[in-house]
Amino acid sequence: MSDIAKMYETVAAINATAHGDVSVALISGLEFSRQLTSAPVLAAEFGAAASDMAIVFTGDDDALVPVALLGIKENENLYLNDDAKWTGRYVPAFLRRYPFIFARGEDDTMTLCIDEEYEGLRVDGRGERLFDSDGNRTQYLDTMLNFVTQYQRQHLVTQEFCKRLSALDLLEPASLSSTDEAGEVRRLVGFKVINRQKFKTI
């Protein structure tokens, strides 16, 4: 199951007819990320994210995706405590944009959507309204639209960055092993990392 499928349950295009009375209440925890073993990161985030978590590359050479490792076992997020509080210093933008996301239409246009199963959605007026009483986007929705738009732009930049890494043959297969308190050894395979020696020569 992909990272997006684990987070977004019921994605719907945002519009004033369906979401005219909907508000988004602030939820302090990140319970929606509980089952994520990794989270995609943008190239622009590498500096901030790398100081807090390991960044590796998954996927085929023509479709590489940089991700931050959050755990080793399936459905394990070690950065989330029992109270759903994030314990790391940096939260990837992939998580910060939730419950919003772009969906690509048949005509290749991008539509802003929301996960209607998000626990912070309200219809009682609490939280940030998506539309005002006249059916116009609120400043909050405009802010989130801008955030997701910038995310999408940086996603395209990241794709080109990964293609360049692959073309320069700077990536190499890697694995990770960890022993838990019970002495059980777990091994994570199927990803690549940057070959530092090759990287230093360019």
Pin down the residues of each PLM region.
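Short, extreme N-terminal leader segments that mark the start of a protein/domain
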Residues: 1-70
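Short, basic/low-complexity N-terminal boundary segments at the transition from targeting/disordered tails
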Residues: 30-35, 73-84, 154-160
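Short, well-structured alpha-helical interface segments that form or flank functional binding sites
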Residues: 50, 90-93, 156, 194
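Short small/polar-residue motifs
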Residues: 51-53, 96-100, 173-174
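Aromatic- and glycine-enriched beta-alpha-beta binding-site module
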Residues: 58, 65-131
